[in-house]
Regions:
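Enzymes that bind and transform nitrogen-containing heteroaromatic metabolites
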Residues: 1-128
Length: 128
C-alpha cells in the first residue's frame, strides 16, 4: 500500500493513474501475523476469511478483487467464493511453487489476453 500511496504524490510516476485508483478503493486486509494496518481506505478483517468474504459479497457495490497467497486463494476456491479467476502466467521459470487447487475444482476458460511483456492472463469462470 505504501508504494501506491507514494505514487499518488508523484506526478512524474508513470503508475500514478493506477495508483490513484488503488488508493481510492476500500481494502480489507487478512493477516495471520499483523493485528493492525495503516493505509488509506484500509481496514483489518475481524472475522475469518470465508465469513468476511461472504459478507462482502452480499454488500451493494462493484466487484471484489482478491490478491493473496496460495492458502488465501485456496480457501476462496474451496468455499465457492470465486466468480472469476484470473491467472497471470509470467514467462519466468521458478521451478517450484504452491498450488492453489486442493481438489477437483471445475473452471472453464472465458478468455486470454497476451501482453507485450510476455505475460498472459487467462480468465476462468467456475463451472456451475
Amino acid at each position: 500500500m505504501r508504494h501506491w500511496e507514494a505514487a499518488t504524490n508523484n506526478p512524474d510516476d508513470p503508475s500514478k493513474p493506477f495508483a490513484d485508483l488503488m488508493v481510492g478503493y476500500p481494502k480489507v486486509i487478512f493477516s495471520r501475523t499483523n493485528q493492525t494496518v495503516s493505509g488509506i481506505n484500509a481496514t483489518m478483517a475481524t472475522k475469518p476469511i470465508v465469513e468476511a468474504i461472504q459478507e462482502l459479497k452480499q454488500q451493494d457495490g462493484k466487484d471484489i478483487i482478491a490478491y493473496g497467497g496460495a492458502g488465501f486463494v485456496t480457501s476462496l476456491i474451496e468455499n465457492g467464493l470465486i466468480d472469476e479467476l484470473n491467472l497471470f502466467i509470467n514467462p519466468t521459470a521458478i521451478g517450484e511453487g504452491l498450488t492453489i487447487f486442493s481438489g477437483k475444482t471445475p473452471f472453464e476458460l472465458d478468455n486470454s489476453t497476451r501482453y507485450g511483456c510476455g505475460i498472459v492472463v487467462n480468465k476462468y469462470v467456475p463451472v456451475k
